[in-house]
């Protein structure tokens, strides 16, 4: 609604129209109906922006629904729009049915104005009551004043109607033109010096605004230039090595994109996040902050965040999607941080993205007037060296300020409010401060298994090549696990010949993969007749100076938070054109116009790899300095720093060498990647390779010993910091992502002795790793260490990205798991069937929690076999999957032969009456089950009858959960009969089942004969207030 703050997307416009349609009839606008639909009305009022809300206020004020005092109460700066909307609903409701009807009409008028602007009526310019007429015709006068506020203000000042101070207040840059017009009208209402009469007469003489200025020639010309510019930047995929020109359209493969769900809020268990398409980025419900403008996409390094934005840009430029935006401005955070001079919003958009050839003033004013048609994207926020803060406020779009202040205020909405912003970042760089200003957060989880295969087929169209690569990955689970990150899929594609010809085994660790790509580049840099079979010492030694130059540059860049290098910086690091020709440094993307082309590493992970290579082999790095790397930051500067305490390592060291200073200043998440690479390079697997390149084998041995000691000591310190267990409970550890990197580093070293030593120190009964970005590679590292535990552990990996490949990686440690929690991990039947095949032989495993995955009837036979074969298995939780009656019937067969299961969860599946019947028949004589959940399974009276027969026979079940089904009175009466014969059930949950007073009376009769049952839940059923009171008095065990 409204000019400057129109509805932010076509989807929201359509939703607002639907909501309005529900209230067009007067009979729908009673106070009772108005109050009943309060949440929808709030959504309607906030579906656009503050401009739309103020348009509604204009109409209500003009119709005298709101008094002047009411109106002033809605002008509290800084109040969230949702708060203002709720206050307006309260005010209108208190005024009666007529006011409620007028609010709906005002919303309708405001929306019509936003879609097809028009003037409403006319007024007498010589009215005897000018202030009253200004209010009566306020919507039309605001629109007429919109483009002429400056001129009218100047004229009013010249004639003495307003002071200079009042002019400055109205002209504050935080206000849009329509808001300035409203503030001028507000001033006229309270001034008795003729300003109202002047405005009423002068505004009538202003030209009628026939349409929004979006069709002006200068605007069309700039939009065309911007589309052409963005299209040119996004049409071709910038491959990591810069050696290929690939059309993005031909090679783009969708990643797994999920909206972040807040599992800590009250209410029913959240559904599994659906895999979203890119086109749903701005239309997904479930906002963290409805008043925010910024969309956040988080993902690990190499997960495809930049390519996702490139795809968005291309779809917009080609006119295929995101057409609600007329202007899209892409920015790279690693480029932005290089801007030392102060800049304004105008400078940022025009000088650093796309320059208007004509009409700069008009185009910039258009952007300010219609921010809802603007999209800004900021790629790589984790590479922006300035930490987010909201302390320094900057609201002027024309006044210059520092680049960090400008960016932070754009994200907060202090600048270009209602313009959409998309930010990509690694998770570790997103602070709680920033999340306050995030509208929606998405997780980019890399390729699915199908995505890996599709990408390889797009990259290799030659007959048989993709098939051979896919077979190789499927036979090599460690390599397959790495490839869920697109950067590794690119490496596999790039090195496909080396992988298919390799006889010594496929890469297992991240370091193995990066050494393989290093071999590929080195071999392609020498004549074909000189190429060796692999990365031998001679090949590496021949280019060692180049690799050390690149390593020195990489380390300096990490320490200075610099990821784009000028010619001067390359020269200072002694990087020669010959070094650049190796291919690891490429032209930076998104180069600032007018500047010389700087260079950057293929990817941030390559910069970390070369920094680790330098630390492993440079004679300038004393071994004792490595402690700074494993500190991951200044002492006490971050949770990671506290996790890895400063280590005292024997050996001489200067007061503060330059390498030490760089390591102390680098970002912790980059140091973690570097530390893992260093551990891999110093492993026994690669010892021979590095030893041939090192003049002093003793120095290399000292580095290796230092890395081992650092890892062992850091893990030991971390384990010792775990608080003792509460009396009667198992010792529990809730790990942080920093712990995952320690385990990853240990895995990169591939030393069983170190893994055993680490496992000995992990004396916990419950290891919790929720929300730790655990993917298949992390699963391999965890299994490498946990398989050596001496006591069984409950391993909780909820809300990660384990997937089928990760499940396969976990199998080596399944024997030491007494419980395995894998909720929300995108696991399918294939992964679970492999897990169960192994679990059949793991006597320790007694509990599986698999909520919110992608399980179907296809895994039912495996589940049934597990139940039938494992007579010490205690709990199976399958909530919110896709199990139908057929799957429930198969599982029931497994239950018939089971004598140990105590907890069985099926909520949110689709077992229906047939499935409920099969389960009930299997459980009638079951001697161990204590808890059964069939919530939300489309069970009716037939299923309830079968469950009632089960209750009549079963003597062990203590809790039966049947909420959100269709049991109704007939089913409840059957259950009541079963309760009369039951002696074990303590809790029966029947909320939201369309039960009336008749069904409740049957339950009351059953309760008279049953002293065991403690609670019967009946909330959300069909009872009047009088019936609720009556039932509650009859038996307090009824929870209504």
UniProtKB/Swiss-Prot annotation:
ATP binds at residues 299-306. One of its GO terms (biological process) is nucleotide-binding oligomerization domain containing 2 signaling pathway. ADP-binding promotes an inactive closed conformation. A lipid is attached at residues 395, 1033 (S-palmitoyl cysteine). SUPFAM superfamilies: DEATH domain, P-loop containing nucleoside triphosphate hydrolases, RNI-like. It is a lipid-anchor. A motif (ATG16L1-binding motif) lies at residues 63-77. This is Nucleotide-binding oligomerization domain-containing protein 2. Homooligomer: homooligomerizes following muramyl dipeptide (MDP)-binding, promoting RIPK2 recruitment. Interacts (via CARD domain) with RIPK2 (via CARD domain). Following RIPK2 recruitment, RIPK2 homooligomerizes via its CARD domain and forms long filaments named RIPosomes. Interacts (via CARD domain) with ubiquitin; inhibiting interaction with RIPK2. Component of a signaling complex consisting of ARHGEF2, NOD2 and RIPK2. Interacts with ANKRD17 (via N-terminus). Interacts with HSPA1A; the interaction enhances NOD2 stability. InterPro entries: CARD, DEATH-like_dom_sf, Leu-rich_rpt, LRR_dom_sf, NACHT_NTPase, NLR, NLRP_HD2, NOD1/2_WH. The keyword Cytoplasm applies. GO terms for cellular component: basolateral plasma membrane; cell surface; cytoplasm; cytoskeleton; cytosol; extrinsic component of plasma membrane; mitochondrion; plasma membrane. Belongs to the NOD1-NOD2 family. Palmitoylated by ZDHHC5; palmitoylation is required for proper recruitment to the bacterial entry site and hence for proper signaling upon cognate peptidoglycan detection. Palmitoylation promotes localization to the cell membrane. Palmitoylation protects from SQSTM1/p62-dependent autophagic degradation. Polyubiquitinated by TRIM27, leading to proteasome-mediated degradation. Polyubiquitinated and degraded following muramyl dipeptide (MDP) stimulation, conferring MDP tolerance and preventing septic shock. Residues 241-274 are annotated as: Required for CARD9 binding. Residues 293-618 form the NACHT domain. It is found in: Cell membrane; Basolateral cell membrane; Cytoplasm; Mitochondrion. The gene is NOD2. It comes from Hylobates lar.
């Amino acid at each position: 609604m409204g000019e400057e703050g129109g509805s932010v997307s076509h989807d929201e416009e359509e939703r607002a129209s639907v909501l309005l349609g529900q209230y067009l009839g007067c009979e729908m606008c009673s106070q009772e109906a108005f109050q009943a639909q309060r949440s929808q009305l709030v959504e309607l009022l906030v579906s656009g922006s503050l401009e739309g809300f103020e348009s509604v206020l204009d109409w209500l004020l003009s119709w005298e629904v709101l008094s002047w005092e009411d109106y002033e109460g809605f002008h509290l700066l800084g109040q969230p729009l949702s708060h203002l909307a709720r206050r307006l609903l309260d005010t209108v409701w208190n005024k009666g049915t007529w006011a409620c009807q007028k609010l709906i009409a005002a919303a309708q008028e405001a929306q019509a104005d936003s879609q097809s602007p028009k003037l409403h009526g006319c007024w007498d310019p010589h009215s005897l009551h000018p202030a009253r007429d200004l209010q009566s015709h306020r919507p039309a006068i605001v629109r007429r004043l919109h483009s002429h506020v400056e001129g009218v203000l100047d004229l009013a000042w010249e004639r003495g109607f307003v002071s200079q101070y009042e002019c400055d207040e109205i002209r504050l840059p935080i206000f849009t033109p329509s808001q300035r017009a409203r503030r001028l009208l507000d001033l006229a209402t309270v001034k008795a010096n003729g300003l109202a009469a002047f405005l009423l007469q002068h505004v009538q003489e202003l030209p009628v605004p026939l349409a929004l200025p979006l069709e002006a020639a200068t605007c069309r010309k700039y939009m065309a230039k911007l589309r052409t510019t963005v299209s040119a930047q996004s049409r071709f995929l910038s491959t990591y090595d810069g050696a290929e020109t690939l059309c993005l359209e031909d090679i783009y493969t969708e990643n797994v994109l999920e909206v972040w769900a807040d599992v800590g809020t009250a209410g029913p268990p959240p559904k599994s996040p659906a895999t979203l398409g890119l086109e749903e980025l701005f239309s997904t419900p479930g906002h963290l902050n409805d008043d925010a403008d910024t969309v956040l996409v988080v993902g690990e390094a190499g997960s495809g965040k930049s390519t996702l934005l490139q795809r968005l840009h291309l779809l917009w430029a080609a006119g295929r999607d995101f057409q609600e935006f007329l202007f899209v401005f892409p920015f790279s955070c690693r480029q932005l941080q290089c801007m030392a001079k102060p800049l304004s919003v105008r400078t940022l958009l025009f000088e650093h993205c796309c320059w208007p050839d004509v009409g700069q003033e008009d185009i910039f004013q258009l952007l300010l007037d219609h921010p809802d048609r603007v999209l800004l994207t900021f790629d790589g926020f984790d590479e922006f060296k300035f930490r987010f803060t909201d302390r320094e406020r900057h609201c002027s779009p024309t006044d210059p300020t520092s680049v960090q202040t400008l960016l932070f205020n754009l994200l907060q909405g202090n600048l270009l409010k209602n313009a959409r912003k998309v930010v990509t970042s690694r998770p570790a760089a997103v602070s709680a401060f920033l999340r306050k200003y995030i509208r929606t957060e998405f997780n980019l989880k890399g390729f699915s298994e199908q995505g890996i295969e599709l990408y390889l087929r797009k990259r290799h169209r030659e007959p048989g090549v993709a098939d051979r690569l896919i077979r190789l990955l499927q036979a090599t689970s460690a390599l397959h696990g790495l490839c869920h990150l697109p950067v590794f899929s690119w490496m596999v594609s790039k090195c496909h010949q080396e992988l298919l010809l390799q006889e010594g085994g496929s890469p297992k660790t991240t370091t193995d993969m990066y050494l393989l790509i290093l071999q590929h580049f080195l071999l392609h840099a020498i004549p074909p007749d000189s190429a060796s079979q692999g990365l031998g010492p001679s090949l590496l030694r021949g280019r060692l100076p180049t690799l050390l130059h690149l390593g020195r540059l990489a380390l300096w860049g990490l320490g200075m938070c610099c990821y784009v290098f000028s010619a001067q910086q390359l020269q200072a690091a002694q990087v020669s054109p010959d070094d650049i020709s190796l291919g690891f440094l490429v032209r930076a993307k998104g180069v600032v116009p007018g500047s010389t082309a700087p260079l950057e590493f293929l990817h941030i992970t390559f910069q970390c790899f070369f920094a680790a290579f330098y630390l492993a082999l440079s004679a300038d790095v004393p071994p004792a300095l490595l402690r700074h790397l494993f500190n991951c930051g200044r002492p006490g500067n971050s949770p990671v720093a506290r996790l890895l305490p400063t280590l005292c390592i024997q050996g001489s060291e200067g007061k503060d060498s330059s390498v030490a200073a760089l390591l102390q200043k680098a970002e912790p998440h980059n140091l973690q990647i570097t530390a893992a690479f260093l551990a891999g390079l110093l492993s026994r697997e690669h010892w021979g390779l590095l030893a041939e390149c090192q003049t002093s084998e003793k120095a290399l041995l000292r580095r290796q010993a230092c890395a081992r000691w650092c890892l062992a000591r850091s893990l030991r310190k971390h384990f010792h910091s775990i608080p003792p267990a509460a009396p009667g409970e198992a010792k529990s550890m809730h790990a942080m992502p920093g712990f995952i990197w320690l385990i990853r580093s240990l895995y990169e070293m591939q030393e069983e002795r170190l893994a055993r030593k680490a496992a000995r120190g992990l004396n916990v009964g419950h290891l919790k790793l929720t929300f730790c970005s655990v993917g298949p590679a992390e699963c391999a590292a965890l299994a490498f260490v946990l398989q050596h535990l001496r006591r069984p552990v409950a391993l909780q990996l909820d809300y990660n990205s384990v997937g089928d490949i990760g499940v396969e990686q976990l199998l080596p440690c399944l024997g030491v798991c007494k419980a395995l929690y894998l909720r929300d991990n995108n696991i399918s039947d294939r992964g679970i069937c492999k897990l169960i095949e192994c679990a059949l032989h793991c006597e320790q495993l007694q509990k599986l929690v698999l909520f919110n995955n992608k399980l179907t009837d296809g895994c039912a036979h495996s589940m049934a076999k597990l139940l039938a074969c494992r007579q010490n298995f205690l709990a199976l939780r399958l909530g919110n999957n896709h199990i139908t009656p057929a799957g429930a019937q198969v599982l029931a067969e497994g239950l018939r032969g089971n004598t140990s299961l105590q907890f069985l969860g099926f909520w949110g599946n689709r077992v229906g009456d047939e499935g409920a019947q099969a389960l009930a028949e299997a459980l009638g004589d079951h001697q161990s089950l204590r808890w059964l959940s069939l919530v939300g399974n489309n069970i009716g009276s037939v299923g309830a009858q079968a469950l009632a027969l089960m209750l009549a026979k079963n003597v062990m079940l203590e809790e039966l959960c049947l909420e959100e089904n269709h049991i109704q009175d007939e089913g409840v009466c059957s259950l009541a009969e079963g309760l009369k014969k039951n002696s074990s059930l303590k809790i029966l949950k029947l909320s939201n089942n369309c039960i009336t007073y008749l069904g409740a009376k049957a339950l009351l009769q059953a309760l008279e004969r049953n002293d065991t049952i403690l609670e019967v839940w009946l909330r959300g059923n069909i009872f009047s207030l009088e019936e609720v009171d009556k039932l509650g008095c009859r038996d307090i065990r009824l929870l209504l």
